[in-house]
Amino acid sequence: MTVPTRNSDGDGDGEHGMNRRQLMRHSAWFGGAVILTVTGGEVISHIPGSTDPTPAGSADLRFVQVSDSHIGFHGPPNMNVTGTFSAALTQINSLGFRPDFVMHSGDLTHLSTPAQFDQVKQMLSQLRTDRIFTVPGEHDSIGDNGRAYRQAFAKNTLGDGWYSFDTHGVHFIALVNTLHLEQLGHLGSDQIDFVRKDIAGLSSDTPIVVFSHIPLFAMYPKWGWGTDDAVQVLSMLRRFSSVTCLNGHVHQLFTKTEGNITFHSAAPTCYPFPKPGQGPGPIPQVLPAGRLKDALGIRTVNYRQGSHALAVKDEKLT
């Protein structure tokens, strides 16, 4: 597996991606799914069931975000996280198009054991896509500072597993903010310096998409829902006309816009957390019978070259 640096045509493996042949050989990874559409360098959100204003053409970029599969979790509110994870994969394969790639935005596993990582790989091998990317969650780094995760999913990446790649005119940055945790997520000086150098030569009209597990904005710091040094990265991204940050971790949909930067938190495929401040903390929330899937989902994103918007569409798990 190679590391995605500046693969502008989007057809190769990328520095962190897998082609279909590698995927079948090595497997891949997964999470709660979300569909985003990039149009003209800007991300546009859509309500599920609404008409997509930018019908996809052959030059469009279409990718899927999934998050927080927590394979290995056993207990209420979801006694079968493998089943809901599998349902999300099936839903991705039934979208009616082949995604250019799928991103799992962390907490692939619950306890980061070799068996759990292997199970995620085997399940993700079902996905009909050419490339799969991941960023780690804190549950993927238990006891070994992320070593087992990097061995399974992040070979040939930089530092603790960060990387970037280009495709369809969009620049993607995948960050790791789940190591060296105290109260909040943390990037560290080496990774911040990587971002500075990575974007230095980019034109300000280049659409930017940033993946991380923990939100880069202060969603609810009391519960650890934020990144203590993210402001240094966000300040560097202010010069770009369109920046979209996609994260997991909070187990619920949430959108916030700050100037040119829009943040989208993804639904999980395992179980929801309470809304910020509604309860003692971010613990699995038990829902009434038959309501679990309403809190789970996938996300798709679409981008049309020459336009100035990313279209983000969140779908409940069916």
Q: Where are the regions that the model predicts?
A:
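Short, well-ordered beta-to-alpha junction loops that form the rim of enzyme active sites
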Residues: N177, F211-L216, G248-V250, E315
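Active-site neighborhood of phospho(di)ester-bond hydrolases with catalytic His/Asp-centered motifs
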Residues: V66-S67, V102-G106, F133-E138, F211-S212, ...
